[in-house]
Structures are given as C-alpha cells and as structure tokens.
From Swiss-Prot:
Single GO MF descriptor: proteasome binding
Oligomer and partners: Strongly interacts with the proteasome-associated ATPase ARC through a hydrophobic interface; the interacting region of Pup lies in its C-terminal half. There is one Pup binding site per ARC hexamer ring.
Claim: Coiled coil is one of the keywords in the record: yes
The protein's name: Prokaryotic ubiquitin-like protein Pup
The organism's place on the tree of life at top rank: Bacteria
Chain intervals with Basic and acidic residues compositional bias: 31-42
Coiled-coil intervals, chain numbering: 9-60
Length: 72
C-alpha cells in the first residue's frame, strides 16, 4: 500500500509561524505595558513633587489644619 502525504509539513510550518507571531504580539504587549508603567511612575513622581512643594511652602498651615481645637 502506498502512503498518502497529508501535508503535515505545511501544518508544522504554519504552527511555527503562528507561534512566532504570538511571541511577537506578546513582546509588543509587554513593551506597551512597560511604557505605560513608566508613564504612570512619572505621573506619580510629579504629583509627589507637587505635594512636597506645597508642604515646604505651607507646612505650618498644613499641620494646623490637622490639629484639633477646643475638643472638636
């Protein structure tokens, strides 16, 4: 009996191509997440710097706002 070629080699090549494409998509997603994390980190640092500036200028007022007066 003669065996029939089912084209299994093509399926393997297609599977490898799909794996490479999936890895490329994962790498892109990872890079996008890294960029987003860096941006958020920069935003948080900016807000913290602004808070520090306000506290340096108005530290006494800031502390007074938290001191209870007359049993409040």
């Amino acid at each position: 009996m003669a065996t029939k070629d089912t084209g299994g080699g093509q399926q393997k090549a297609t599977r490898n191509t799909e794996e490479v494409e999936e890895q490329a998509q994962d790498a892109q997603a990872s890079e996008d997440l890294k960029e987003r994390q860096e941006k958020l980190s920069d935003d948080v640092d900016s807000v913290l710097d602004e808070i520090d500036d306000v506290l340096e200028e108005n530290a006494e007022d800031f502390v007074r706002s938290f001191v209870q007066k007359g049993g409040e």
